[in-house]
Swiss-Prot record:
Site (Discriminates between blocked and unblocked aminoacyl-tRNA): N9
InterPro entries to which the protein is assigned, alphabetical: Pept_tRNA_hydro, Pept_tRNA_hydro_CS, Pept_tRNA_hydro_sf
Keywords: Cytoplasm, Hydrolase, RNA-binding, tRNA-binding
Site (described: Stabilizes the basic form of H active site to accept a proton): D91
Entry's Gene Ontology BP terms: protein quality control for misfolded or incompletely synthesized proteins; rescue of stalled ribosome
Pfam families listed in its UniProt record: Pept_tRNA_hydro
Lineage: Bacteria, Bacillati, Bacillota, Bacilli, Bacillales
Subunit structure: Monomer.
Family of this protein: Belongs to the PTH family.
Protein name: Peptidyl-tRNA hydrolase
Encoding gene per record: pth
Described purpose of this protein according to its UniProt entry: Hydrolyzes ribosome-free peptidyl-tRNAs (with 1 or more amino acids incorporated), which drop off the ribosome during protein synthesis, or as a result of ribosome stalling.
Active-site residues, as the UniProt record annotates them: H19 (proton acceptor)
Catalytic activity: an N-acyl-L-alpha-aminoacyl-tRNA + H2O = an N-acyl-L-amino acid + a tRNA + H(+)
């Protein structure tokens, strides 16, 4: 079973913020397929659905970002999901808006949600899709920036990015060939 995790902070005030882009991608996939996060357990909202005949576990942690691993690890353990079947979607300050990077494994890169997942799983050997949100300008702090909603102009770009990342997930579920998916979906979204 594949496991798709979108990272974000819970609560209405965090909807459509830069830090919640992982939630946005998972929500897009769920809505497109008429799925819903119908279970809550282990500090997470989740569902198990079939896509292309395969079971897929979708998770959104119901913790704050820096505690994401406290939801992801127990749910994966409960359903016997191996880290190599995990893909985490999250915001990345080091990528410009409109860029998407898929990686087979790697460090947290300073992202507290990823640090928590790596710590709780005991490995960084899992797939991830990093979604560029750019860096703050005009002296804005990083926390203020990532908790800021996208402007209307930015949302035009980010809607394309959300759809692009969702297609990458769908392609991986269909083919199980993440290396091919990386080749097709890495880069700037037009």
């Amino acid at each position: 079973m594949k496991c798709i995790v979108g990272l974000g902070n819970i609560g209405k005030r965090f909807e459509l913020t830069r830090h919640n882009i992982g939630f946005e991608v998972v929500d897009y996939i769920l809505e497109k397929n008429n799925f819903s996060l119908d279970k809550q357990k282990f500090k997470g909202a989740y569902t198990i659905e079939r896509m292309n005949g395969d079971k897929v576990l979708f998770i959104e942690p119901m913790t704050m970002m820096n505690l994401s691993g406290e939801a992801v690890a127990p749910i994966m353990d409960y359903y016997n999901v191996n880290p190599e079947d995990l893909i985490v979607l999250y915001d990345d300050l080091d990528l410009e808006q409109g860029q998407v990077r898929l990686r087979q494994k790697g460090s947290a890169g300073g992202h507290n949600g990823m640090k928590s997942i790596i710590k709780m799983l005991g490995t960084d050997q899992f797939k991830r899709i990093r979604i560029g949100v750019g860096r703050p300008t005009n002296g804005m702090t990083v926390p203020d920036y990532v908790l800021q909603r996208f402007s209307n102009d930015e949302m035009v770009t980010m809607e394309k990015v959300i759809e692009h990342a969702a297609r990458a997930i769908e392609k991986f579920v269909e083919t199980s060939r993440f290396d091919h998916v990386m080749n097709e979906f890495n880069g700037e979204v037009k």
